[in-house]
């Protein structure tokens, strides 16, 4: 399914009319003077709904993930994603087949930190591909919002250079199945690392104002693959070429003596 001529204004109108953000959530309003419209960017407040605590940027409230996915199979999902410049039907099982996976959950399109992260991962995509890692961005925005954002020049806050797909989780089912749906109705800023068998190896959550580290994400994939290949475990600050440990007491003693003595 290919869409052309999707305007930024109509896309933002669509997302604002479809996102069921709770009560008085003032989501992401910064004036885009170049386009003479308001786009989403800064959360200012959320009133208490059904006993949920008030949220403000100063509190940095994060919804607790009730159950960890680490060590379990990643939930599979289908839907619409933006791939290059086309909107396509997406199947996670097909996309991540025989590959490691990085799911980059982010709050919303047209925001501050999110485009810097997505483009940061995108410019290092070759490093992920060399490790057989496929990257996918996920948010609750509409496919039309993704497309409008992708069509917007980077100098205007867009993500036009983006090289990996953006999945549209408008139903919130994907974010919910991963335990990453915030009370405000959008996803946590979170990274999910998956091995080739579809098992979740690492989940990281970040406050809305904190951007992720691409280098740290690559280091974690190196550690996952090293442990799989050798059967060894990776100690603190491990990176490729560093000493590792066998999972036994003698190896631990030797490592600690060499490293901290």
Regions found by a protein language model. Name each.
Residues 2-19, 25-31, 37-261:
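Chalcogenol-based redox active-site neighborhoods
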